[in-house]
């Protein structure tokens, strides 16, 4: 078996391939670090008034929380 006259991967081609394969990974890692730094540097508000979760209606039955009306087609309960 004869070897090709021009090698498929020469020294220049290898460094070129390594550069173009490592560049997207390095760029993605850099952007992820910058994004995480941005998220962690934001001050969290102690009183988030726009986030208000009222869990009491979930622990009560519908008759206790005043949600007694039924929707059309829901007279007997859930039908799967």
UniProtKB/Swiss-Prot annotation:
Q: Which residues carry this modification: Phosphoserine?
A: 63
Q: Which domain of life is it from?
A: Eukaryota
Q: Report membrane topology.
A: Single-pass membrane protein
Q: Where are the transmembrane segments?
A: 16-36
Q: What induces it?
A: Induced during adipose conversion of 3T3-L1 cells. Up-regulated in 3T3-L1 adipocytes by troglitazone which stimulates PPARG expression during differentiation. Down-regulated in 3T3-L1 adipocytes exposed to TNF-alpha and to retinoic acid.
Gene Ontology annotations for the cellular component aspect, listed alphabetically: cytoplasm; lipid droplet; membrane; nucleus
Task: For this UniProt record, give its keywords in alphabetical order, as a comma-separated list.
Answer: Membrane, Nucleus, Phosphoprotein, Transmembrane, Transmembrane helix
Per the record, the GO terms for biological process are:
brown fat cell differentiation; positive regulation of fat cell differentiation; spermatogenesis; white fat cell differentiation
* Pfam families (alphabetical): Adipogenin
Tell me yes or no: is Hydrolase among this UniProt entry's keywords.
no
The record's annotation in InterPro entries points to: Adipogenin (IPR027938)
Main location per UniProt? membrane
Q: Does the keyword Transcription regulation apply?
A: no
Task: Provide the free-text tissue specificity comment from this protein's UniProt record.
Answer: Selectively expressed in adipose tissue where it is particularly enriched in brown adipose tissue. In adipose tissue, expressed exclusively in adipocytes and not in the stromal-vascular cell population. Expressed at much lower levels in heart, stomach and muscle and barely detected in kidney and lung.
Localization (cell): Membrane; Nucleus
Family, similarity comment:
Belongs to the adipogenin family.
**What does this gene product do?**
Plays a role in stimulating adipocyte differentiation and development.
Question: What is this protein identified as?
Answer: Adipogenin
User: Where does this protein come from, organism-wise?
Assistant: Mus musculus (Mouse)
């Amino acid at each position: 078996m004869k070897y090709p006259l021009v090698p498929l991967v020469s020294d220049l081609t290898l460094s070129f391939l390594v550069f173009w394969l490592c560049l997207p990974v390095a760029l993605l890692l850099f952007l992820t670090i910058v994004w995480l730094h941005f998220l962690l540097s934001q001050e969290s508000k102690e009183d988030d008034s726009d986030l208000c979760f009222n869990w009491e209606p979930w622990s009560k039955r519908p008759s206790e929380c005043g949600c007694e009306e039924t929707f059309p087609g829901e007279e007997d309960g859930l039908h799967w």
